[in-house]
């Protein structure tokens, strides 16, 4: 609970347009999750009842409440680190890149996040750009950059052609 709705819903929408299998995950014991501004989403699965062995991507939306909860979830942090160490993809936007910084995932990488969180990107060079993609990690600055961030995820998973097709569908400039 406490996720940034624009970031979460934009990512969900764009990935589904690209026909990427996506599971919305509740970190709590109920499938209903409430965002920072009172918008409720229905999660597909509960984190505590799901195995992540076959997942290609961990995507962390921002939001002050959800990021605080994620910081305190040692099981999730272990799963994220294991996922990263296996060469699978990790994406974080807004406040949540700070979690990647804490885990050492951003070491010697360019990264971005909300400007107020730039000092939490341990080991990274903060760029302040809308998105940064390095190796198997993508970071996003914040809600206003959610479309670019989601298109970046599509490009990583499905390639530039699919990302361009989704961008054109949304009347985004492709270049």
Describe each region flagged by the PLM.
Residues 25-45:
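N-terminal beta-loop-helix "entrance" segment that forms/cooperates
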Residues 1-10, 14:
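N-terminal beta1-alpha1 ligand-phosphate binding loop
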